[in-house]
């Protein structure tokens, strides 16, 4: 078990790897400089290895209902911890979170996948298709209009709506150009991306069975992913 070093304003229990990960991330959010990082490199190596094991376990859990996921390697889902500061006013060299985007098509694919984000006070799960190019985005919207009954049966299902009440992170103010202004469900074609997320308290990840629970959430999300991904498949 990783031992945490409680040097930040936030203090986590030291009896599980998830708490040690969050403790480290809380610490580096305060001491976000290269000297501190290198002085605590052993801690980083330990918590990052623990996060890789978490992702491996999550891949196994998702593979039960999404067999394509079994082919995904842990490394392919992870992101660099160093920040790209070239165009940012924030020159902090390191991120304040660990993230994993589990997508059999790869992180850079337009296809949607499953996302896990660990960050003190801002942990979440999510998924869907981000940063879609305009023609693909239009195709997804068009498919929603053409198959609105199927789409509504997915996103208005009580289990889904309870976890993911909002589709998309940013939205147009009006119906997109080229679509019927009288379409009765404009909220489903106004999103600028087709992603969903569900925030979770830090303490959620201290429970032994949290990966099983998150896998259940992702299973509920899968029909939404399938709808979006099938449209992308048809377009590409």
Question: Where are each of the predicted segments found?
Answer:
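Charge-rich, low-complexity terminal tails
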Residues: 183-236
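Acidic, low-complexity proline/glycine-rich segments
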Residues: 2-21, 188
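Contiguous, amphipathic alpha-helical segments that mediate oligomerization or scaffolding
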Residues: 20, 26-65, 216-235
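N-terminal low-complexity, intrinsically disordered segments
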Residues: 2-7, 87-95, 202-205, 212, ...
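Extended cationic-aromatic binding surfaces that line active-site or macromolecule-binding grooves
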Residues: 49-105
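Aromatic/basic-lined ligand-recognition segments
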Residues: 81, 173-186
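Compact, glycine/acidic-enriched structural inserts
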Residues: 120-179
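Aromatic- and glycine-enriched beta-alpha-beta binding-site module
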Residues: 84-145
């Amino acid at each position: 078990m990783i031992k945490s070093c409680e040097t930040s304003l936030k203090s986590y229990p030291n009896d599980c790897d998830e708490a040690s990960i969050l403790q480290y991330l809380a610490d580096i959010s305060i001491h976000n400089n290269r000297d501190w990082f290198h002085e605590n490199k052993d801690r980083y190596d330990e918590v990052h290895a623990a996060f890789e094991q978490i992702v491996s376990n999550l891949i196994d859990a998702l593979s039960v209902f999404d067999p394509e996921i079994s082919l995904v390697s842990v490394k392919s889902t992870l992101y660099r911890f160093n920040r790209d500061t070239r165009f940012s006013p924030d020159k902090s060299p390191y991120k304040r979170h660990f993230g994993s985007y589990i997508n059999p098509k790869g992180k850079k694919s337009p296809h949607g996948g499953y996302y896990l984000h660990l960050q003190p006070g801002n942990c979440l799960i999510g998924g869907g298709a981000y940063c879609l190019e305009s023609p693909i985005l239009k195709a997804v919207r068009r498919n929603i209009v053409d198959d609105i009954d199927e789409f509504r049966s997915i996103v208005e299902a009580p289990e889904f709506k309870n976890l993911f009440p909002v589709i998309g992170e940013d939205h147009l103010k009006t119906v997109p150009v080229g679509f019927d202004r009288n379409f009765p469900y404009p909220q489903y074609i106004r999103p600028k991306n087709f992603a969903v997320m569900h925030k979770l308290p830090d303490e959620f990840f201290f429970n032994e069975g949290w990966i099983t629970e998150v896998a259940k959430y992702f299973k509920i999300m899968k029909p939404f992913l399938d709808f979006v991904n099938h449209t992308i498949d048809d377009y590409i």
